[in-house]
Amino acid sequence: MKVKICGITDMETAKRACEYGADALGFVFAESKRKITPGLAKEIIQELPANVLKIGVFVNESVEVIQKITENCGLTHVQLHGGEDNHQIRRLNIPSIKSLGVTSESDMKNAQGYETDYILFDSPKEKFHGGNGKAFPWELLAHMPKELREKTILAGGLNTLNIEEAIRTVRPYMVDVSSGVETEGKKDVEKIKQFIIKAKECSK
């Protein structure tokens, strides 16, 4: 099971997450309490292992700005949380992830229409897109076609207490956590460690 830790804002957390086995780190460039500047993101990314995915999170940003930040920071993928369509995705010409809020089983069919490398299924948006700490009914994704499952990233309210059930129900390619590994709004490296251990153990 691949694991993504999202909302990275400091070097120490990024390095520890990689040491514990994180496969991907997320850097939020959209409005969020976890927003990071491109300059700081670049400093952190330059120190990370080559095999770890560096994913930039954007919401309804222009193609030109996304391309500039991707190039300057050394991102490997972009994660799109707004109303981006296939025309914009093709113009980006960057490995991409489309985030969709899940409210019904029909969202799986909608997901198959996007020309992205991965689909991230998340809880419906609230004030900010993603990172709200709320789970959605995972059984809505239980009967996913194999070709979609192989590119699915599961997010939304995941933590060390529910990650095993979430993986058993959805069987995604990757799981994505942000608030579920925080204490009082800050990333907690011990929670990150335990989350990664549980996610990887229950998928063996």
Curated annotation (Swiss-Prot):
GO terms for molecular function: phosphoribosylanthranilate isomerase activity. It is an enzyme of class 5 (isomerase). Keywords: Amino-acid biosynthesis, Aromatic amino acid biosynthesis, Isomerase, Tryptophan biosynthesis. Its EC number is 5.3.1.24. It comes from the Bacteria. It catalyses: N-(5-phospho-beta-D-ribosyl)anthranilate = 1-(2-carboxyphenylamino)-1-deoxy-D-ribulose 5-phosphate. The keyword Translocase does not apply. Signal peptide: none annotated. Pathway: Amino-acid biosynthesis; L-tryptophan biosynthesis; L-tryptophan from chorismate: step 3/5. One of its GO terms (biological process) is L-tryptophan biosynthetic process. Belongs to the TrpF family. This is N-(5'-phosphoribosyl)anthranilate isomerase. It comes from Bacillus cereus (strain AH820). The lineage of its organism: Bacteria, Bacillati, Bacillota, Bacilli, Bacillales. The gene is trpF.
